[in-house]
């Protein structure tokens, strides 16, 4: 499994808004490049071609959105429609509902998505319980809410 790294760096000659607008192009390039046979990559672990806080209808921190749901569907199709190497989406610490929405969007875009790799998006809401409550409450959260979240994500991939 191979994960190309893409992130905004303030040292680059690019402001954050411009980076966000170019991110789909970067993701498309990374996926296409590392799908080449010469790299012999079996699975690509890649992020969504848009940031969660930039999509209308997704939870954000008061930032203004630059993409509609339909824009994101088109972007997803453009980036991955001719996929040749299996790929999974990583959560990159997205809020759970945003990751779920992004995964649903990917599934509805009819791209050849293999699956997902998700960590923080599933359990990050349990940190306060871990820090401010007790072990039993934390384990209860993981066993109930955490498992429910994994099931929801899996259902997106298995439901047609």
Locations of regions flagged by a protein language model:
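Active-site beta-loop-alpha junctions enriched in small/polar residues
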Residues: 3-9, 46-51, 89-96, 120-123
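Catalytic cores of alpha/beta
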Residues: 94-111, 125
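Structural signal for hydrophobic packing residues in well-ordered secondary-structure cores
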Residues: 38, 110, 154-157
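C-terminal helical cap(s) of enzyme catalytic domains, especially alpha/beta-barrels
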Residues: 123-160
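Alpha/beta enzyme core
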Residues: 6-83, 102-108
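Structural preference for beta-strand elements that scaffold enzyme active sites
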Residues: 1, 40-45, 86-89, 113-117
